[in-house]
């Protein structure tokens, strides 16, 4: 028996004895490494909807309240819950179990079925050359290495303050060790609600009316629950909670030999790779691409032959004008980037911004006005465009400008490299470099596909009217022949 199988067998034994987890005879842990899925939970018999797959007592959940560190140093509990936070606290608790207690830890068999550091593919483990494979995805701005290094330094300081045998661990707790434990928590932890134990009896009735004031979330590792692979389209089980235990329950009938899937949240492939180190090869149900504000500005400059200074003035007014903020009920419409979903959905703020800027570029003499007069005109245009978009209408040039925005964003992508992405076949073991390359291309394909779907969104979901009609309404007069000729009707090449 190899180490992988032995660790799995010991873990299953630990689940039923030490952890006292009740496991249905209809499921088993299976080795799917040949399919690049590691360990997985598979049905050995047909499971009906609402059946309980396993039941976990809260005492077998690893958190800052159940760790041996808190038992050995009771004063840390309040600090971790109220100052350090359960995230950093849980990292410290796990480090204590793994490095100080080692085989004496209650959780030792559990730790041995965690992914090994060499198997981790979350983006924090990628080197600079590998991260370049993900350009131009904005996921590169969300990796958070700087914040992670700051947390690592805080944790070393906390360990030294605890003292005793534990303080010696601080000298060898390198960033890579920290990143490993932090990524395990990010990938597999659950947030469990807990009641604020500091509430006294006299306040109980009042605070029960304000439940959110009392509820807090505890970052927790849940044995076996974290063994389920996740898929946004195949999710067939869900973790439920009560005061004494947690239950994994079937969301639908699960056939014999079918894998049991959970879901990590409504994440696109880029976020699945960043957080958890994997991608969904057929694309995530929640994939999206992102159009940049600079793409919109460049598209407008090309379409209307306007200059950057004028557009910057318009955008500054849209950002800072108090009356406009009131019209929009505090909703920001000027963002650095805008999500474009794989079902063709666009944020209303995005369409409104493109419509407003498109009209501003066509108002005669607007750029010659002083700032106060220009602000008044922009306020009026925002009102008119808001009414237009809320009525599911947009102008011809808004639609054309939007298509040009998409074209500009797509031009940043290596489209030819991402046309066809094949899922690694069973038994075809890829090197780490090969796997990361194909996962990066799958992320880019997800974003490209989403952007392409959104190109026709305005034409499909809005009644497109001539710009001249809206301009006449705004100016309260018909356009002169000269003004009519200056109203652009851009042709966007396919």
UniProtKB/Swiss-Prot annotation:
Cellular component, GO annotation: nucleus
Places the protein is found: Nucleus
Transmembrane segments: none
Keyword Transferase attributed: yes
BP terms from Gene Ontology: methylation
Residue ranges occupied by any SET domain in the UniProt entry: 25-265
GO molecular function terms noted in the UniProt entry: protein-lysine N-methyltransferase activity
UniProt cross-references to SUPFAM superfamilies, sorted A to Z: SET domain
Xref: InterPro entries: N-lys_methylase_SETD6, SET_dom, SET_dom_sf, SETD3_SETD6_MTase, SETD6_SET
Any single Pfam family the record assigns to this protein: SET
Primary location: nucleus
EC number(s) reported in the record: 2.1.1.-
PANTHER family: N-LYSINE METHYLTRANSFERASE SETD6, UNCHARACTERIZED PUTATIVE METHYLTRANSFERASE
Note: Present with 4010 molecules/cell in log phase SD medium.
Family classification: Belongs to the class V-like SAM-binding methyltransferase superfamily. Histone-lysine methyltransferase family. SETD6 subfamily.
Name recorded for this polypeptide: Ribosomal lysine N-methyltransferase 4
Organism: Saccharomyces cerevisiae (strain ATCC 204508 / S288c)
Lineage of source species: Eukaryota, Fungi, Dikarya, Ascomycota, Saccharomycotina
Gene behind the chain: RKM4
